[in-house]
Amino acid sequence: MSRKTYEKIANINGMFNMLEQQIIHSQDMAHFRSEFFYVNHEHRENYEALLIYYKNSIDNPIVDGACYILALPEIFNSVDVFESELPFSWVYDENGITETMKSLSIPLQYLVAAALEVTDVNIFKPSGFTTGMNNWNIAQMRIFWQYTAIIRKEAL
């Protein structure tokens, strides 16, 4: 292995160690959320607002994780989030995938689809997870990894 590969492995291991610590210390929610990966300050503000709006996010890690993804500025600014009963109700309806979902960038469509797959809702074939893993850049990967830490915060 070249030194560069070792550095990549060390960085990835460091990120997973950080995510594990977030899960371990998830009972301190203010600290837990302050350590999250946010694409920018707006992402964090949107997330905090959604947690207040979707009150069941406190007891439901799936809703909490959905709020984290929905808070991404590109999604948050495209969706009338406060008209939805659940964070992802805008993704599809009786006619299939909505125009709002189709208007998102392709990597974010995969991210939303991968998050829905956690609840056995599959909107893409191949899956959003599979397609995302083959196409996401490192920031999008970090968003997905953070999402997994949120929904699994009770794992330890």
Ranges and model annotations:
Residues 1-107, 120-156:
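Extended, charge-biased low-complexity segments
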